């Protein structure tokens, strides 16, 4: 009988992967401040010597890592409208887009702060840009507030569509503001028509975005990886913190709240197998958290297959499994299979404007995951999230300002956020390029629609101002980022265009921004210590149920709740 990954609740072991390691030569890079770092000796997440070189020298750069996870035959296809998807061979043609680094690649700050996109709204026609901005705000006001009028909103949206209609054909003359306004107009129209899941769940949002061809999604994601630091910034920071935390452990278990395409873990695997001290790579086990039902579980399985194939290709001992959220999207620690002796790590990537994941899970779901991983005795928790203007600092009093301002304020917050993303992508993605259009259509447009829908519902709560305050209030403590991690972030930004900034807002947190706008942050935390069971009074017999202390600092759980349901299934090797 053929058994698929969806039928198996356990891990997918790669017993054929030995512990042989490849030792990279130590190489030093100047970070621009006169200090030289021996990257090879410290086994960084990114092999910077190779990352900065071309493929001709045989180096395993990050682009190669990503491309190795994408099958060529998945990048060609036909969309629902009959148009062919972008072929893998076309992705690097010069006539499609240009990779234009800034004149000063080591710079991570800018001397030209201001509101991006709005600085030059329509490339020579600022009046039209201001009109678009005012009409968008008026449409948002017409959809909410004490004087809302759906008919007025409909009239305004008709006018907006007339003003941006030429952007539908990816007209080279369309400005950044016009293209951005077109997507926000569509998002508002979706609210008016009820085509966006205003009152629906995350699964409905996933279904709404599933019509894009899988090859187009992967292609757009890879292009976004190549042309911007949005994904790499959070991934590299989290991975470096994980490497440092588990450097002495022989078995590592990462529970990933939103694995997406699984790209984050390729660089971690490479770092584990290329330690300069010759220590064999630890066994890595990744458990991906998925939603109950169809599409989410299948996407996780595909990510697991790609990661498993990549691990086998570099000799990384690896196994992969998944656990599902409850129907109300709550995380239950009992669904995670625990093995004695593993260093447990929680990875939580949330709310990214430039990502293929368009769904923002409820704050209650995120909170249940963070508290659940603390209850399991996680050694480290990494959090990557969007950075809102309401969170100027973790200790400020402006946490609820965005929510207090209602839909219009939150709508304008999202408009400013995506205008910064648009502006930052312009240097790497010329407006007229096919790749730029693909990224906008497949990634940014669905994310804008989701952001506007969430703002309309006002569902973000504490998630809008970041999780720092909640985690401190729940007993989590900040884990300071190493100097190495800070330097790695600065080097990463040096590979891209001027205008990107990196800012330290706490000992455990760094923020990626574009000019004056904060966009996303990465932070590292340690969960509160597990409570030690109290001893019963002398002479009193008190049975211990499922919480006996163990040497690893965690606790043993009842077999009924935590183990039996997983061990009935055999492990399968994927070839």
From Swiss-Prot:
Please give the chief subcellular localization of this protein.
nucleus
Q: Where is this region: Leucine repeat II (LRII)?
A: 302-334
A Pfam family of the record is GRAS
Region Leucine repeat I (LRI): what ranges? 130-202
Cellular compartments annotated: Nucleus
Spell out the residue ranges making up region: PFYRE.
344-450
Gene Ontology MF annotations: DNA-binding transcription factor activity; sequence-specific DNA binding
Source organism superkingdom: Eukaryota
Composition bias of kind Low complexity appears in 103-116
Q: Which InterPro entries match?
A: TF_GRAS
> Any miscellaneous information on file?
Plants silencing NSP1 and NSP2 exhibit reduced expression of the strigolactone biosynthetic gene D27, reduced levels of strigolactones and increased shoot tillering. Rice NSP2 is a homolog of Lotus japonicus and Medicago truncatula NSP2 genes, which are transcriptional regulators essential for Nod-factor-induced gene expression. Although rice roots cannot form root nodule symbiosis, rice NSP2 is able to complement a NSP2-deficient mutant in Lotus japonicus. Rice NSP2 is able to complement a NSP2-deficient mutant in Medicago truncatula.
Q: Identify its protein family.
A: Belongs to the GRAS family.
Q: What is this protein called?
A: Protein NODULATION SIGNALING PATHWAY 2
Chain's gene name: NSP2
């Amino acid at each position: 009988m053929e058994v698929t990954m969806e039928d198996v609740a356990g891990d997918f072991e790669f017993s054929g992967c030995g512990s042989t390691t490849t030792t990279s030569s130590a190489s030093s890079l100047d970070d621009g401040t006169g200090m030289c770092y021996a990257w090879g000796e410290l086994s960084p997440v990114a092999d910077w010597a190779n990352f900065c070189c071309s493929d001709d020298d045989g180096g395993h750069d990050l682009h190669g890592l990503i491309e190795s996870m994408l099958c060529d035959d998945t990048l060609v296809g036909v969309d629902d409208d009959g148009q062919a998807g972008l072929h893998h061979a076309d992705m690097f043609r010069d006539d499609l887009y240009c990779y234009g680094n800034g004149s000063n690649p080591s710079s991570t700050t800018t001397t030209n702060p201001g509101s991006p996109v709005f600085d030059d709204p329509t490339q020579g026609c600022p009046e039209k840009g201001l009109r678009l901005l005012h009409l968008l705000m008026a449409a948002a006001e017409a959809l909410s507030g004490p004087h809302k009028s759906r008919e007025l909103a409909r009239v305004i949206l008709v006018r907006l569509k007339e003003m941006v209609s030429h952007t539908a054909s990816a007209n080279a003359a369309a400005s950044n503001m016009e293209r951005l306004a077109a997507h926000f107009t569509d998002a508002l129209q979706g609210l008016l028509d009820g085509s966006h899941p205003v009152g629906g769940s995350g699964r409905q949002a996933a279904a709404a975005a599933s019509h894009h061809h899988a090859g187009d999604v992967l292609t757009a994601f890879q292009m976004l990886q190549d042309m911007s630091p949005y994904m790499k910034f959070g991934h590299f920071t989290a991975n470096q913190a994980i490497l440092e935390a588990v450097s002495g452990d022989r078995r590592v278990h990462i529970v990933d709240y939103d694995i997406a395409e699984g790209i984050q873990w390729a660089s971690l695997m490479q770092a584990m197998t290329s330690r300069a001290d010759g220590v064999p790579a630890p066994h890595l086990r990744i458990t991906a958290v998925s939603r109950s039902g169809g599409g989410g579980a299948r996407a996780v399985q595909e990510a697991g297959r790609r990661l498993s194939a990549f691990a086998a290709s570099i000799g990384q001992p690896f196994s992969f499994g998944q656990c599902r959220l409850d129907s109300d999207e709550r995380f239950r620690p009992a669904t995670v299979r625990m093995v004695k002796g593993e260093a447990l790590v929680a990875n939580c990537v949330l709310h990214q404007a430039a990502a293929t994941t368009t769904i923002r899970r409820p704050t209650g779901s995120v909170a249940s995951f963070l508290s659940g991983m603390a209850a399991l005795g996680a050694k480290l928790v990494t959090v990557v999230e969007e950075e809102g203007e309401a969170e100027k600092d973790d200790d400020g009093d402006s946490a609820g300002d965005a929510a207090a301002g209602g839909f219009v304020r939150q709508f304008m917050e999202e408009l400013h956020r995506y205008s910064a993303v648009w502006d930052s992508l312009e240097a790497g993605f010329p407006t007229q390029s096919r790749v730029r259009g693909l990224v906008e259509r497949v990634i940014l447009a669905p994310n804008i629609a989701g952001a506007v829908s969430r703002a309309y519902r006002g569902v973000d709560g504490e998630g809008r101002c970041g999780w720092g305050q909640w985690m401190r209030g729940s007993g989590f403590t900040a884990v300071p980022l190493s100097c190495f991690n800070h330097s790695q972030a600065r080097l990463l930004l040096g590979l891209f265009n001027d205008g990107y900034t990196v800012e330290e807002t706490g000992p455990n947190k760094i923020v990626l921004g574009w000019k004056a706008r904060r966009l996303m942050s990465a932070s590292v935390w340690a969960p509160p210590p597990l409570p030690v069971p109290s001893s019963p009074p002398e002479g009193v017999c008190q049975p211990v149920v499922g919480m006996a202390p163990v040497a690893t600092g965690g606790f043993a759980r009842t077999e009924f709740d935590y183990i039996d349901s997983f061990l009935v299934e055999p492990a399968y090797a994927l070839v």
